[in-house]
Amino acid sequence: MSGPEVHHLFHAPIADHSFSSDRQTLAIAKENNVELYQKSGSRFTLKDELKGHDKTVTGVDIAPNSGMIVTCSQDRNAYVWEPSPTGWKPTLVLLRINRAATFVRWSPSERKFAVGSGARLIAVCYFEEENDWWVSKHLKKPIRSTVTTLAWHPNSVLLAAGSTDSHARVFSGFVKGVDERPEASAWGERLPFNTVCGEYLNDSAGWVHAVSFSPGGDALAFAGHDSSITVVYPGGPDAPPRAMLSIPTQTLPFTSLIWNGEAEIIAAGYDCEAFRFRGGEAGWEMVGGVEAKTRPSLGAGAREESALHMFKQMDLRGKAKDDTRLNTTHQNTINTVRVFEGSADGVKKFSTSGVDGRLVIWTL
């Protein structure tokens, strides 16, 4: 595995990030705005800024085919941004929520997107041609607390959600007139809107930080605040799961995860690094970290500054070393893990971003 490609964009937290399908455009959620970067050689250069929200932007996602960008924020709003000759044109989405929007993702079909919120509901949004605006339907029951994370099934109908009521759930987000009726699967056959196809608790009933369907859609993984990853294999409509496997770890909690094929999961979070899990219905285990633990070398200027700092510390405190640098590439919590390059068979590259203002592209 080659070394990671590190882009230290700024000294502020990155709440979320998303790449365009050609991987030349990068959208970064920074404070109240979304910054758009363009690939220029080996660097990303700031090209544009999407301004419309007046509170912290919590989610951003670029639709792979249309290139439209959806954003959501603590100001309880979501915008769909479309490219135009004069720049990016925003359209306000009618979310109808009275608490912060927490998370947003396009469905694979790109006909709709889902927004999680602190209002104990999920807004499933779609475009209404007659009125020329984006409207929403609400998934409410049986959610009892803030929705922290969402993930679409490959069929664009089923939607997984994690929340602070400690449950990971699978809902039907079928919208008549927008979706085609999906084929029967292990999650169910007839799937009217708001059908609960699965509801799961991990061993310690901790907050759920991340959810993700396997590439084939027949398994669900979720990360809890007890530092565990749980993998569920559904048993069919109205039947208990064939298997529900919890993998305890000694790390800090994970905040985001992706599948690498059907037999590997990559998760990252408060430990500032990504970890790999491998297994199947018979069992799962953590096999180790993605990165080699070598401290990045300092450049000449940094070495000079470090030497000056050392002598200053010796003079002021009587000690030579006060090194707070972590031996990981990220120097703070990783908020988002995304597939950068790959297919259903496996991931070739993935990207991470976090509180340290770094975006890192990893090669597997």
Task: For each feature predicted by the language model, list its residue ranges.
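Terminal intrinsically disordered, low-complexity extensions flanking WD-repeat/beta-propeller proteins
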Residues: 178-199, 242-364
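Conserved strand-to-loop turn within each blade of WD40 beta-propeller repeats
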Residues: 29-31, 72-75, 116-119, 162-165, ...
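Beta-propeller domains
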Residues: 155-177, 208, 215
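Structural hallmark of WD40 beta-propellers
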Residues: 23-27, 66-70, 80, 110-114, ...
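Feature marking well-ordered beta-strand scaffolds used for ligand recognition
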Residues: 76, 211, 228, 327-330
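Eukaryote-specific detector of the first structured module of a protein
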Residues: 1-79, 86, 111
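Canonical WD40 repeat/beta-propeller blade segments in eukaryotic WD-repeat proteins
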Residues: 11-19, 55-62, 98-106, 144-152, ...
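Per-blade loop-tip surfaces of WD-repeat and WD-like beta-propellers in eukaryotic adaptors/scaffolds
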Residues: 1-4, 34-47, 77-98, 109-112, ...
